[in-house]
Design a protein with these regions (language model features):
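PLP-dependent amino-acid enzyme catalytic core
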Residues: 1-497
């Protein structure tokens, strides 16, 4: 299996190169040249396997230059009870008849990013060894909150790596900020940016592809890579949990093998829902992919109209991990939907860079409307949904998951579709305690974040994750705030270039 760049179909590399580079030299994203298939018999054969074994089975289809031993080394180390608070790794909870929550937040940082970022360091260090690179790998991360902490936790003290995380100073929750700024490890760095997530992401991409910076790194015996979902090594682990959850639903008798399900994903950067698209096109019977956005609803408008327009007001919301107006992974989807037309991709994304806007052709619009349904939910709707779920079903969810539930309710109201549905629950309610409490116990005001965590615990009976409880006594190590234009200098200075 080779990987191509979305901006140069003639470029072909193996998965180890795609993972170690993170992004193609032309600024494109790596995609597998074909989507491997998984048959119903294969899905059935996974029923009695552990999550780690299911993951290894899926990875073997995509990472064909890795040996079985290398893949199992990665999966065995990443997906274990030493990293996750459940041996199932991801849990499925029935919310109400035929609607299930896929809980992806049982890892060390209490967000779905752990599902990929616990294994990415093993993928990356294995790739570097396979390629005999003999270079220190410098991981640059732009984060809207969850990726940063999950990447820091995954890469801390990993030999031969250094990681730097940039986050919008006013664009993450207080718990997310505390998680990042207290990070332990000798090879980690964290810096706040005056601006929003898109400023962080655009400048990280710019630093990545700057030839002069690349040359300076090369001379110093270093090379960049990415832990964002622009890196294929981040995206492919997300495909696994959609494959695995279908198998679990069938094994538990909730569905029969072959039955279609809908999948609802709250998303800003489009990676999590793109992983579900890959699972569907491998052979997992997924009917509709439902894309849930907050008021930064650029994806909703795009899926409905075929026009991508980031020229709009940016809102800081209670679901900050989705406060994004430039959805990087959309480039991969459009490459697939245009039958790998790299010229169209370069044209559209050139227009996005220059004008902040592009419109896809009618063929792509047609497929978008067939495969996807999109909706959005504002902060008030999010708050009401958290309360409704808590009151009706005694289930406590975070803000991002609430957005997904509300959009799914809108989908059902519009379509009447009663297909059984899996909703991706992307973060622990404890990561957004203030917003959760504002919904379910508005009298709880004036508390600090740790009192809020304790109050959520009293109301929900969900165990407080140890990693969050321990934050109270940790010292803040990283307090620097810079402008987006200072990011490149910060990187160079941090690396001693």
């Amino acid at each position: 299996m080779f990987y191509k760049s979305t901006r140069n179909s003639d470029l072909r590399v193996e998965s180890s190169t795609a993972i170690s580079q993170g992004i193609s030299v032309d600024g494109g994203l790596f995609v597998p040249e074909t989507i491997p298939s998984i048959s119903m018999d294969e899905l059935k054969s996974l029923a009695d396997k552990s999550y780690s074994e299911r993951a290894a089975y899926v990875f073997a289809k995509y990472l064909t230059d890795f040996t079985d031993a290398e893949i199992h080394y990665c999966t065995d180390n990443a997906y274990s009870v030493k990293n996750f608070d459940t041996e199932n790794i991801a849990e499925i909870a029935e919310l109400f008849d035929g609607t299930y929550m896929l809980e992806l937040w049982h890892g060390p940082t209490c967000a779905f990013k752990d599902m990929a970022l616990q294994i990415l360091p093993y993928f990356l260090t294995t790739s570097v060894k396979k390629l005999n690179l003999n270079k220190k790998v410098v991981i640059l991360v732009a984060t809207s909150g969850d990726t940063g902490k999950a990447a820091l936790e995954g890469f801390k003290d990993v030999e031969g790596t250094q990681i730097m995380v940039f986050y919008p100073d006013e664009g993450v929750s207080s718990m997310q900020k505390r998680q990042m700024t207290t990070q332990e490890g000798s090879n980690v760095g964290v810096c706040a940016i005056k601006g929003n997530f898109d400023d962080c992401q655009s400048n990280v991409k710019k630093i990545f592809t700057d030839p002069a910076m690349k040359e300076r790194l090369d001379k110093a015996g270093m090379a960049f890579s990415s832990a964002n979902s622009i890196n294929w090594g981040r995206l492919v682990p997300q495909v696994v949990y959609y494959v695995s959850s279908y198998v679990t639903l069938a094994k538990n008798g909730e569905i029969n093998y072959g039955d279609e399900i809908n999948v609802v994903v709250p998303t800003g950067n489009f990676g999590n829902i793109l992983a579900a698209y890959y699972a569907k096109h491998m052979g997992v019977p997924i009917k509709k992919l439902i894309c849930a956005s907050n008021i930064n609803n650029v994806l909703t408008d795009f899926i409905r109209t075929g026009v991508y327009d980031r020229n709009r007001k940016f809102y800081a919301t209670t679901s900050p991990s989705m406060d994004i107006l430039i959805s990087s992974n959309l480039e991969r989807l459009l490459y697939l939907l245009t039958n790998e037309n790299d010229e169209k991709i370069k044209d559209w994304f050139g227009k996005l860079a220059a004008d902040g806007k592009y419109e896809v052709d009618d063929d792509v619009k047609k497929v978008l409307s067939e495969e996807f349904w999109a909706g959005y939910c504002d902060d008030n709707g999010t708050k009401n949904t958290i309360k409704e779920i808590f009151d009706k079903y005694s289930y406590t969810c975070d803000t991002h998951t609430a957005v997904a539930v509300k959009v799914y309710e809108d989908y059902k109201a519009e379509t009447g579709d009663t297909t059984k549905t899996l909703i991706a629950s992307t973060a622990s309610p404890y990561k957004f305690s203030s917003s959760v409490l504002a919904a379910i116990d508005p009298e709880s005001t004036g508390m600090d974040e740790y009192d809020m965590v304790e109050r959520v615990h009293q109301l929900s009976n969900i165990p407080v994750p140890k990693s969050l409880a321990d934050l109270k006594n940790k010292e803040r190590r990283f307090t620097k705030v810079i402008s987006k234009d200072e990011m490149e200098d910060f990187v160079a200075e941090s690396l001693g270039l």
